[in-house]
Amino acid sequence: MSGNTFDFVVIGAGCFGAWTAHELLRGGHKVLLLDAFGPAHSRASSGGESRVIRMGYGRDELYTRWSLRSLAAWKALAQRTGRTLFHQTGMLWLTGAEDSYARKVRQTLEYLGIENESLSARDLEIRFPQISAEGIEWALWEPGSGALMARQSVQALVADGLRQALHGGCEDCSIATPIP
């Protein structure tokens, strides 16, 4: 790598760093992605087996929109790479009578047209008989949410970015582990 120049250096090959480098590469830039331990290593927050992707973030429409966009990007990556990166398991919010946050989540999901369903305590026990509704006022079901296979996803993303860079003629684009 000595003597190479890059348009951008991205520090950290976790979820945010990997996506940043990936999008810069797609934009035709020469990118160096640095991480002390490599993409999605066990010390990184993106290095675990799974992370929840959900749409509900209270009244925060911006974060909810970002979550939708993020999920679409992960699904597109899975399609390109032929790997199973996301498991659509749904997200179930269990709420008490005083839970204003869940009500805000529901309002935001409704406003943005995101599929969701409110369940009474009785409906909850019928739909999910393994859950006791004792102390639960109502539940909110987000069927489109689920689990992202975090480590595999970030590693697939970095590999996909490098593939795209090489096909675009960027032989110098790389991932490096700094030498102490």
Enumerate the predicted regions with their spans.
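Short, flexible, mixed-charge acidic loops at enzyme active sites
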Residues: R43-S50, I131
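Glycine-rich FAD pyrophosphate-binding loop
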Residues: L25-S46
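Dinucleotide-binding Rossmann-like beta1-alpha1 core, especially the glycine-rich loop
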Residues: S50-R127, I136-E137
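Short beta-strand/turn micro-motifs composed of small residues
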Residues: G12, D35, T95
